């Protein structure tokens, strides 16, 4: 988001046309939602927060745009180009460290090609560079918060022996 704002300025957007506000929803978000000079709210996140925002915005007749809790499947059929599918599935799952609503959160694979696809997906994922998200060569950066880290860790632990964390 920060880079998008920088690029919009470089593209000639006047100052103040696009504003990216970072912070906790309970503080920064609430201030924006309740400010009389903010006519429109766009939010991407969880359904509980989205519902609360919709109620607050409706009371003030503010326009809203909500993208809530997307769960996007990535589907691989037997006739797919498995190399390309694995590369794209890894990219889809880990873009923005998997923390955006349009990331592939489920991969559905036709059983006849599952073993080959798994092997290729592991290779594609292993080839991704983990590091500073500000560096162009980085594919996977840090998680946004400790609470999100714990959520990811819990998801890994919840599947028990049917999944593995690989380095």
Predicted regions and their residues:
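PLP-dependent aminotransferase-like
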Residues: 1-29
């Amino acid at each position: 988001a920060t880079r998008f704002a920088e690029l919009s300025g470089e593209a000639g957007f006047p100052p103040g046309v696009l504003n990216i506000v970072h912070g906790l929803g309970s503080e920064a978000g609430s201030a924006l939602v309740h400010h009389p000079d903010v006519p429109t709210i766009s939010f991407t996140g969880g359904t509980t927060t989205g519902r609360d925002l919709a109620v607050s915005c409706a009371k003030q007749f503010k326009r809203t745009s909500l993208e809530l809790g997307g769960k996007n499947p990535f589907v691989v059929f037997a006739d797919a180009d498995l190399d390309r599918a694995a590369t794209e599935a890894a990219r889809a799952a880990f873009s923005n460290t998997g923390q955006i609503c349009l990331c592939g959160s489920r991969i559905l694979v036709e059983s006849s090609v599952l073993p080959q696809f798994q092997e290729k997906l592991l290779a594609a994922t292993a080839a991704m560079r983990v590091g500073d998200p500000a560096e162009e060569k980085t594919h996977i950066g840090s998680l946004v918060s400790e609470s999100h880290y714990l959520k990811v860790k819990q998801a890994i632990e919840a599947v028990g022996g049917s999944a593995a964390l690989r380095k």
